[in-house]
């Protein structure tokens, strides 16, 4: 399924995803078949007739098949002797496109499915037939994001037809190969993000049911606690090159302005009081016998 980070503009969806990718880049390298453009799982080399034996011995479930390029190399260069195929280790990298694929939003005139699944190298078509794996250039987001993560940036800004590859990737764990080639196994996490208005517009269209069924939305709200907003500003200031003196309570005042601009008006409390209540403070307004319940304020804002 697709993990969808959905929320208002500036809530931190992209920043959250950047932290996920950074954690992946700092994680341990993975083993994969040398020379494979999708960093193939080495256990895919095991023939299906022997997989049950390997699974019992290793205690793991072997899923998936070799990509067309590795299948060709195994047959042509190693005479189907899978134990001779070299295996190496490599880490994850966004810049080098290793295990992390990013799909930016594109307009309808420039949408090309090769961004997702790669393409055929036209320069090789005069030497090899169309169904020869050597003409494949598996550099799409679902290829480089195999065994890692694929990020769909502002996913619903794309045309719905552009997202059809996501259906097979989530339902069958397979993505189509460019040209006249077999489907390619995909083992990765798909994370998308979008704004609230785009999500509401997308789910309101009944023709999008196939993709909607595969989406798990996670709401990323604004920070409504004053103390947490101050921490965010303090962290950003500490990481910046800004070294000038900052007057006392500057961050608190800026945080108050930000938080109060996000709160909806209510007849139960004035904006400052509501901000204090959301911050966990016990506040009793003048003329009231008991304190205002934060649950009542949240229910009213929904």
Give names to the regions the model predicted.
Residues 1-302:
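Conserved ASCE/P-loop NTPase catalytic core
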């Amino acid at each position: 399924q697709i993990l969808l980070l959905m929320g208002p503009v500036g809530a931190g969806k992209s920043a959250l995803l950047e932290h996920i990718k950074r954690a992946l880049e700092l994680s341990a390298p993975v083993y994969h078949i040398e020379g494979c453009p999708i960093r193939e799982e080495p256990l895919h080399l095991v023939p299906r007739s022997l997989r049950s034996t390997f699974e019992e011995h290793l205690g793991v479930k072997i899923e998936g098949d070799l990509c067309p390029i590795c299948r060709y190399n195994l047959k042509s260069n190693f005479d189907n002797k899978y134990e001779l195929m070299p295996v190496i280790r490599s880490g994850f990298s966004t810049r080098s496109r290793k295990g992390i694929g990013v799909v930016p939003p594109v307009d309808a005139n420039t949408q090309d499915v090769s961004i997702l699944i790669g393409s055929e190298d036209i320069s090789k078509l005069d030497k090899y037939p169309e169904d020869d794996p050597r003409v494949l250039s598996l550099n799409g987001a679902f290829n480089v994001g195999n065994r890692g993560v694929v990020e769909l940036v502002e996913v619903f800004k794309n045309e719905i037809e552009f997202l059809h590859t996501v259906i097979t990737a989530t339902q069958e764990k397979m993505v189509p190969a460019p040209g006249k080639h077999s489907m390619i196994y995909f083992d990765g996490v798909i994370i998308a993000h979008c704004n609230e208005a785009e999500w509401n517009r997308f789910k309101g269209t009944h023709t999008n049911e196939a993709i909607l069924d595969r989406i798990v939305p996670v709401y990323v709200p604004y920070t409504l606690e004053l103390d947490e907003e101050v921490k965010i500003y303090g962290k950003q200031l500490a990481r910046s090159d800004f070294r000038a003196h900052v007057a006392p309570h500057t961050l608190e005042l800026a945080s108050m302005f930000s938080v109060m601009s996000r709160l909806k008006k209510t007849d139960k409390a004035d904006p400052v009081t509501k901000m204090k209540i959301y911050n966990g403070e016990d506040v009793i307004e003048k003329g009231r016998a008991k304190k205002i319940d934060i649950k009542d304020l949240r229910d009213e804002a929904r």
